[in-house]
Amino acid sequence: MYKIVLVLTLFGAVNGLDKICLGHHAVPNGIIVKTLTNEKEEVTNATETVESKTLDRLCMKGRKYKDLGNCHPIGIIIGAPACDLHLTGRWETLIERENSIAYCYP
């Protein structure tokens, strides 16, 4: 009898794990750097996460997002011409690609 209850409990637990969300969560790593706006800014690094339940901060289902492609977020802020296309529309989450180019103007 206990085995049957245990098996049914396991099936019930596995049933709730049918949705997996992948994402990144930024965590502070303790390194302090000097930036353009702050003398002492703690650097964060992104940690890849896999979640078995929907977390609003990580999952993209039902959210409006903007894929920046090769444009870096700094390029949008400083007004790089290649990033002008990303100034239109509304979005909740930005997707930054690993191969994005950060533009520097003198």
UniProtKB/Swiss-Prot annotation:
Glycosylated residues, chain numbering: N45
One GO biological process term: fusion of virus membrane with host plasma membrane
Subunit-level organization: Homotrimer of disulfide-linked HA1-HA2.
Main function: Binds to sialic acid-containing receptors on the cell surface, bringing about the attachment of the virus particle to the cell. This attachment induces virion internalization of about two third of the virus particles through clathrin-dependent endocytosis and about one third through a clathrin- and caveolin-independent pathway. Plays a major role in the determination of host range restriction and virulence. Class I viral fusion protein.
InterPro entries tied to this protein: Capsid_hemagglutn, Hemagglutn_HA1_a/b_dom_sf, Hemagglutn_influenz_A, Hemagglutn_influenz_A/B
Transmembrane stretches, start-end: none
Protein's UniProt name: Hemagglutinin
Chief site of localization: virion
Keywords carried by this UniProt record: Clathrin- and caveolin-independent endocytosis of virus by host, Clathrin-mediated endocytosis of virus by host, Disulfide bond, Fusion of virus membrane with host endosomal membrane, Fusion of virus membrane with host membrane, Glycoprotein, Hemagglutinin, Host cell membrane, Host membrane, Host-virus interaction, Lipoprotein, Membrane, Palmitate, Signal, Transmembrane, Viral attachment to host cell, Viral envelope protein, Viral penetration into host cytoplasm, Virion, Virus endocytosis by host, Virus entry into host cell
Subcellular location(s) of the protein: Virion membrane; Host apical cell membrane
Protein family membership: Belongs to the influenza viruses hemagglutinin family.
Signal peptide stretch: 1-17
Note, other: Major glycoprotein, comprises over 80% of the envelope proteins present in virus particle. The extent of infection into host organism is determined by HA. Influenza viruses bud from the apical surface of polarized epithelial cells (e.g. bronchial epithelial cells) into lumen of lungs and are therefore usually pneumotropic. The reason is that HA is cleaved by tryptase clara which is restricted to lungs. However, HAs of H5 and H7 pantropic avian viruses subtypes can be cleaved by furin and subtilisin-type enzymes, allowing the virus to grow in other organs than lungs.
Keyword Repeat included in the entry's annotation: no
MF annotations from Gene Ontology: host cell surface receptor binding
Pfam families: Hemagglutinin
Species for this entry: Influenza A virus (strain A/Duck/Manitoba/1/1953 H10N7)
Entry-linked Gene3D superfamilies: 3.90.209.20, Hemagglutinin Chain A, Domain 2
Keyword check for Cell wall biogenesis/degradation: no
